[in-house]
Structure formats: structure tokens, C-alpha cells
């Protein structure tokens, strides 16, 4: 069964309903004023399921109506350590099987357990991912360049070279906070996650350097980093077109990213699974869900998002034409 909610109605109904749940909370889409701007039938759809389970992932993928075909990449984060909050391999296995996917990841630019192809692959082994599917460290032989058509900071993006080998991508993201981006969802998973190690330095420094050794001495203002991520996403989306779906799992909602090997404990209860064909809409829906949650544990996550100017990435991505922040929310039962 589906329940269609738009605008302020979605926020009010879901917030009230979630208050009755002990293990899942959610908020929803844009304001009533936004509803007056665009009819609901012209808005991108974000599907939502409260229960976080393998069956729910299969259901929400099917609801999107876009079948993964050809050589399929499933973009995840394998996480920095076993203390990190990366998605459980057993949670995602049926979906990965359904799309006959390869789990893909790239090396980090800051040291740690995933800084080389060998250690990045070993991390995937250690965290149980190679037991459920093939794993491809996409920058194991270097980077490829994708041009950015509309930019302030990045004339091009540097992605793991194997990215170009895939016909379709499932961007399967753990939605949570992030110590630099404010929050991490579909857009961050693409902008940083598909970037090679050199590309990560390039995006993080807004085009100042592609040398990971020089990253920390060249960090820009938060708002510029947010725009840089948007431009990296533009290059990726221009390349992949409509051969992509976006699924965000909002659980273990720490203020810290899965790249943190010792993240702060989650204070906000799990929200559910969100999915869309629009990356801006699905991330906006997750941000709205955090804000609208009746759970008082949301406060530190909201503060993290705002302090790092996380919502600016959504504004800029929308300006670049990557998606919309107005959406309709369809809850699946």
C-alpha cells in the first residue's frame, strides 16, 4: 500500500506517526508555499519505508521502476573500521543479488585503512563485503577525467578509472552526519565516493590540488567545499545519465561519517529507507526527516549539518540542475 503525501502535510503526518514508533522516526518534504509553486504531479517522487530490512530494500528498489541493466555498480562505503557505521553486508545482500551488482569503492586521500588499493580491498574483506559480492576498488589503476560543464571551482572531476566500465549504478548510501560535509547521503557518496584518491583531494580543496599530501593545507571555506561536491556530482550525472537510482538508508545516525574509525554514538533513532530517481530530492527528504523527527536526539545532528553548511550543497546542486528540493513523499507499507 502506498500513501502519497506532499509538502507540509507530509511533514505533519509523518512526524505525528513517527512519534508513535519506538524505533523509527521520519520527517518529510518542502513547505506549503512550495506546494503552491509546483503541482505535486510534476515533483520528483521520494519513496519511504520505515522498516529497515533486506525486504524493504528490495521493495523500495522495485518501486522506483528503473531496472538496473548491464554491468551494475553498487556504490557503498565499506567504512574505516569495524566501529564505523557502514551498512551491514547482510542488510544489502539481497538487493545486490537482485541487480547482479559489483560493490564499488575508491581509495581515501587521508591515510587510514583504505588509502591504497590493497588496504581498501582488505577493508572490504574484513567488513564482510567480499563475502556477499565482487568488490572493485575503482581507482586501483588510477583516475579518469570527467569534464564539468557548469562550474565555479572544478573544470573537471577525477574519478576512479573503473567507473567508466559500468553501465548502471545503484548509489546505495548510509545517510548520517559528516565532520566536513555536515551530512552524507547520495550526493556526497557520488562526489567523494566515486572520486579517486587524487580526485578526493581535488574535490576537498575545490580544485587547488589533486595531491593528497597537500589536502589539509588547502581546505576552502565550508560553502566552497559544498559547491565543489555539487560540481563533481554534475560531471558524474552527465556521464551516467538516467542509468542510476539513489537509495539512502537512514540508520545509526551518528554526527560522524563512516570514514571516521571511532564515530560518536548515534543519538537519533533510525528513520528508515528513502529512495528516488532524483539525488537532490532524496537527500533533501532525509534532511527534512531529521529536522521533523520528534526525537530530541536529533539536535546534535542538526547542529552538525548547519555548522558545516550542509544544506548549501542541496541549494547549489539544484542550481546546477541536478535535481529538486521540492518533492512528493510516498510511504510504502
Question: Which role does the model predict for each range below?
Answer:
Residues 9-14:
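Hydrophobic helical h-region of N-terminal Sec-dependent signal peptides
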Residues 21-37:
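Short, low-complexity, disordered segments immediately C-terminal to signal peptides
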Residues 38-333:
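Extended, low-polarity segments enriched in aliphatic/aromatic residues
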Residues 16-19:
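C-terminal motif of bacterial Sec signal peptides marking the signal peptidase cleavage site
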Residues 1-8:
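Bacterial N-terminal signal peptides that target proteins for export
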Residues 7, 26-28, 169:
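Hydrophobic transmembrane signal anchors and adjacent membrane-proximal interface regions, especially
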